[in-house]
Amino acid sequence: RHYAAMGHRGLGNGVMLDASTVATATVPHYGDDGQTLTQGMSLGYMLGGMSADSLTGWRFAPWHGAFGHDGSGGRAGMYCPKYDLAIALAKNAHTPSGFALATWSLVVRAIADALGLPVDVD
């Protein structure tokens, strides 16, 4: 519900973020040199569609402009403005940190396939 409320239509009686804040939240922040993308993050959110060599890589979300965050043990959520799509995953067992996004990636791909959405990563 948190990420669904970020959509342009909001959820229930309100919109959590206005369009300008969503636009700002999807702009990658670069290193001190202004050119090196080291983390694939913006405003504390992990960004989708990042290159494989960034900290988050494309594994978080395959769509440019998608943003969200994972949590301890493999829980994650994201919103993709391009497709007005929110996805959340809550697991009932802790996953070791090296594998935290493994299930998430499978879930996101399955949802993309089911909805006929392209996986538009570089």
Residue ranges and their predicted role:
Residues 1-122:
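Catalytic loop of the DD-peptidase/beta-lactamase superfamily, centered on the K-T-G motif
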